[in-house]
Amino acid sequence: MIVLATSEGVKLGRRLAEELDAELAPVEEDRFPDGEQIVRVPPELDGTVVVVHSMSPPQDENLVKAIITLDAARENGAEEVIAIVPYMAYSRQDRRFEPGEPVSFRAVARAVSANADALITVDLHEPGTLKYFDVPAENVSAAEELGKYLAERFEGEDLVVIGPDEGARELAREVASICGVEYDHLEKKRLSGDEVEIHPKELDVEGRTVVLVDDMIDTGGTMVEAARALRDQGAGTLYAACTHALLTRNAATRLLASGFEDIIATDTVPNPFEKVSVAPPVAEAVENLSG
């Protein structure tokens, strides 16, 4: 088994190779004069090849890189190609919102499936959309690794884990279960792409260390509003935790300025707040899916 990692997946790829006791080979990346991408993988591959690449922003560019890297692995002799795409672009466009629109995530899933025998992703925005892949696909959770990290970092503190909305409730529950602490969630109404309104809800947070956890932090709007609601209820120190730290539109600056002590993220996308690796559950999924 060999692990191929693009520049977007190299940190996770290195850790995954260690977990699998496999060889790691970086993917060479270059551009033609017109800006088009070209990748190169080791020639004369054989056996199982694991391709690690994240579709972090810029998503369209990284979607193309995923497609051509998987094609390169297949064309250079891989007998089995397992795609590790920890963050899947377009995952929030999983249905037709207006007449005439595509189901964008379905199109992306089909494109990535073309040169893969199996695919693994992490904390997919809507797990039910795994059905859009044309190959066996597994969605693994970062909850256990996040929970272990929080349990060690906040040992002895009066900790509570909060989901910023109903959609984050299950992740908050799983993380809190690993930590052995209480959990709850807030309720929100989305006003626009980066504007939300948090509905008042009484929570037992006064004076406590609070970790707000969600599958992804994009613009940070939800987290900022959630922090305001929790501070109004007397919460102590606030932390923001997530699987996918996209952190667009100066989100990190907004979060820290709004009172968060720190941001805790995994290595599914390149980011400066990575403290937790999803390599262990991904490695387990590779072993389960590999023929």
From Swiss-Prot:
Matches recorded under SMART domains: Pribosyltran_N (SM01400)
Molecular functions (GO terms): ATP binding; kinase activity; magnesium ion binding; ribose phosphate diphosphokinase activity
Residues annotated as catalytic: 188
Compartments it resides in: Cytoplasm
Coiled-coil region: none
UniProt cross-references to Gene3D superfamilies, sorted A to Z: 3.40.50.2020
E.C. number: 2.7.6.1
Keyword line: ATP-binding, Cytoplasm, Kinase, Magnesium, Metal-binding, Nucleotide biosynthesis, Nucleotide-binding, Transferase
Pathway this chain belongs to: Metabolic intermediate biosynthesis; 5-phospho-alpha-D-ribose 1-diphosphate biosynthesis; 5-phospho-alpha-D-ribose 1-diphosphate from D-ribose 5-phosphate (route I): step 1/1
Identification of the protein by name: Ribose-phosphate pyrophosphokinase
Organism annotation: Methanopyrus kandleri (strain AV19 / DSM 6324 / JCM 9639 / NBRC 100938)
